[in-house]
Amino acid sequence: MTLKEKCAILEDRVKRLQEIGLALSTEDDINVIFELIMGEAKNITNADGRTLYMISDDAKTMKFEIMATESMNFAQGGTTGIEIKIPPMQLFDEEGNPNHSSIVTYSANTGKTVNIKDAYKEKGFDFTGAKTFDKNTGYRTQSVLSVPLKNHENDIVGVMQLINAKDPQSGKTISFSADMQYQIDSLASQGAVALTNKRLVAE
């Protein structure tokens, strides 16, 4: 790739981030904001699976707001009108300690992005739920990216989880690259600010 081509790609990314930032800042419907965030995450990574969680006002749980898996033609929450009936995730255990067992609760509690190449080879987090889902459906969870939505005050308002990035040419599952992660971190920050502003207006 030539320097000119690299510059063109960079300019396109900056323009796209500006466009999505404007869209997020002017939208009033919170469900549409959810969809804008996750739709752009899909554009950046070509991820097959996407889940968006929002942290409760008491900061003890995370509610599922969007769940989607392209290859299974599955979508709930957001603007679909289909309620997600999965219980919220607990951010603390019974003793009051931060729950770091799953990558999304870890991201919520620490503010750190987690990028995993293969969930089945990962020893640091509990992927029992994903493996059970895979066993029941024939799916194969592989690459996983968990990103906290951190606003301008450094408060974490939610977490975005992306599953199975896809190569746009071959369609094969690939890892989330460092470049993808950087762009998603930027998107998550924009989304967090928009959601925080929406909550402030609602109050």
For each of these PLM feature ranges, what is it?
Residues 1-36, 43-44, 197-203:
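Signal-transmission linkers at sensory-effector interfaces
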Residues 39-42, 48-56, 60-64, 104-106, ...:
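Short, hydrophobic-rich beta-strand element in sensory/regulatory alpha-beta domains
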Residues 51-98, 121-122, 160:
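GAF sensory/regulatory domain recognition
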Residues 58-59, 150-156, 165-168, 182, ...:
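Flexible loop/coil segments at beta-strand boundaries within sensory signal-transduction domains
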Residues 100-105, 112, 117-143, 165-175:
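Signal-transducing coupling segments at domain and membrane junctions
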Residues 109-113, 159, 182-203:
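Signal-transmission/dimerization alpha-helices at domain junctions
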Residues 142-151, 158:
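A short, aliphatic-rich beta-strand micro-motif
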